[in-house]
A protein has these predicted regions:
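Active-site residues of response regulator receiver
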Residues: 150
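A short alpha-helical cap/connector motif
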Residues: 1-146, 154-179, 183-216
C-alpha cells in the first residue's frame, strides 16, 4: 500500500499526522507533471502551490537507512513543502541529534516546509536554505551521511541532479548514501562511473528510485 504510512517505521503521532496530511493533500497540475510532460512549463515558480514530494515508501526507506547508519548530517534537495525533510528530521531526532540541510528555490515552499517541520515538532533539526542549490549546498558544514537528490526536472543537460551530485560528492563520507527520484540520465551516468566512487541500484519504488553508496 504505497500511500499508507500506518505500517511504517515512524511512531510519533505528530510526525505521522503531518505526513498523512501531506499525502492526502497531494495533487498534480491539470497540465501534468513537468517530469512526465516535457511540453509544459518547467519554471518552478509556476508550481509554487504544488508539492512534488517523495512517496511514503521512499520516506520509510530513507528514515530506516538514516537510523541504521546513525546519520547526523543529511542533505535534502529539493525540499519542496517538506515531506522528505520531515522523514530526515525525524531520523535525526531519533538518532539523538543531527541536522537536515534542505534547499528550496521557491520562497512560498520554503515557508511551507518550515511550517510543516514545526507542526511535526522537528524544526530544531532542520536548516532549510532558500535559493539555488548550486550555491546553498556548496558547503554542508561537514561530512554528509545521506543526500536526497530529488530536484527540479529542468529538461536539459547538465540536469540539476547532475550538477548537485557533483557539488555534494566530495562532501559525502565513504559509506554515505545518495537517493535519487527522477533517474536523470546524466546523474545515473555519474554515479555508475566507478571513477566517481559510487555503486548503485535501481529500486522498484515509485517509478524507479536510485540508491547509491559511496565506497571510495
Amino acid at each position: 500500500m504505497q500511500n499508507d504510512t500506518r505500517l511504517g517505521p515512524l511512531k510519533d503521532a505528530r510526525v505521522r499526522a503531518v505526513i498523512e496530511r501531506l499525502v492526502e493533500a497531494r495533487r498534480i497540475p491539470s497540465s501534468g507533471s513537468p517530469s512526465d510532460h516535457p511540453e509544459v512549463s518547467r519554471d518552478p515558480f509556476d508550481y509554487a502551490e504544488y508539492g512534488f514530494s517523495i512517496w511514503p515508501d521512499q520516506g520509510d526507506l530513507l528514515y530506516l537507512l538514516c537510523r541504521g547508519m546513525r546519520a547526523t548530517r543529511v542533505v535534502d534537495f529539493a525540499t519542496s513543502i517538506g515531506m522528505s525533510a520531515v522523514y530526515f528530521a525525524a531520523a535525526m531526532r531519533d538518532n539523538g541529534g543531527g541536522i537536515v540541510i534542505g534547499s528550496e528555490l521557491v520562497p512560498e515552499k520554503v515557508k511551507t516546509a518550515r511550517r510543516n517541520l514545526a507542526d511535526a515538532g522537528l524544526a530544531d533539526y532542520a536548516d532549510i536554505r532558500e535559493g539555488d542549490a548550486r550555491q546553498t549546498l556548496s558547503d554542508a558544514g561537514g561530512p554528509v551521511d545521506f543526500a536526497l537528490i530529488d530536484g527540479w526536472p529542468n529538461g536539459q543537460e547538465p540536469s540539476l541532479a547532475r550538477e548537485v551530485i557533483e557539488i555534494l560528492a566530495p562532501q559525502i563520507r565513504t559509506g554515505g548514501y545518495v537517493m535519487n527520484d527522477n533517474a536523470e540520465p546524466d546523474f545515473l551516468q555519474f554515479v555508475r562511473d566507478p571513477a566517481n566512487g559510487f555503486i548503485s541500484v535501481t529500486l522498484p519504488l515509485k517509478r524507479g528510485t536510485e540508491l547509491c553508496v559511496k565506497v571510495s
